[in-house]
Swiss-Prot record:
Protein name (Swiss-Prot/TrEMBL): Uncharacterized HTH-type transcriptional regulator YkuM
A biological process term (GO) from this entry: regulation of DNA-templated transcription
Family, as annotated: Belongs to the LysR transcriptional regulatory family.
Domain named HTH lysR-type: residues: 1-58
Stored InterPro entries: LysR_subst-bd (IPR005119), Tscrpt_reg_HTH_LysR (IPR000847), WH-like_DNA-bd_sf (IPR036388), WH_DNA-bd_sf (IPR036390)
PANTHER family: HTH LYSR-TYPE DOMAIN-CONTAINING PROTEIN, HTH-TYPE TRANSCRIPTIONAL REGULATOR
PROSITE patterns to which the protein is assigned, alphabetical: HTH_LYSR
Membrane-spanning residues: none
Keywords attached to this entry: DNA-binding, Transcription, Transcription regulation
DNA-binding region positions on the chain: 18-37
Primary gene name: ykuM
Disulfide topology: none
Record flagged with keyword Transcription regulation: yes
Amino acid sequence: MQLQELHMLVVLAEELNMRKAAERLFVSQPALSQRLQTIEKAWGTKIFLRSQKGLTVTPAGEKIIQFANDVTLEQERIRENIDELEGEIHGTLKLAVASIIGQHWLPKVLKTYVEKYPNAKISLITGWSSEMLKSLYEDQVHIGIIRGNPEWKGRKDYLMTDHLYLVDTEISCIEDIAHTERPFIQFKSDSTYFQEIQHWWHQKFKTSPKQTILVDQIETCKQMALHGIGYAILPSVTLQNEDKVNKMPLLDMKGHPIGRDTWLLGYEPAFELKQVQAFVQVIKDMLDQENPF
């Protein structure tokens, strides 16, 4: 089998959907289906079962896909070793980044990185910090940028802290929250963030909010607060250049600002790769030059 065919099987196994896999591979669905049939014929067995719900990997397919994964990873490793011998920054930088950081801070970091190292490639996934940590544990990525205080036995570099604010278009004093009928707009988040907010709230008010609205995305939560629908608690990274809303810092019982730390994590061998070293240096230089939030 050619490496291109192995990569195709890896993508199909990840998506389990012909349309999505075809989009990722930049081919048409009929062409992808025909190539899959050719591969299955060469192996003499079905790799996937097709249904209206998508694809299901067969027992034989599991072994073939594991082989495809192993060969693909080995190919990447050899390419990285060759790139290191040539002394230039090549290879793929694999990142797993918390969504908030990926949306509001990472783009300018990556812009600098790709301008300095145009031959390097980037593979990026974003999501809740707990999901990104799982990708790191499973060795799917080189580097994780995680919020909170994750348990990690490898290298763990502190990057920054952004403080939490209660934002509202009408209320300008946190104590007034106890008397308002306005809804508390919340967004779905990982458990550690939710627990921090719950802990602060019950220490401060000793009772539950009178009304709540729960939305899927932090940006939806922010826009609803900015448009006066209710109040929200948001990290400062999402509030840059937002001057038309009241922003009240959350303080703990000792009067200290409450914030969320952001960390750069990875296994030690990953930091030996030149593309990873270059990325870490870009971040360090950027943090030395400016306050991120």
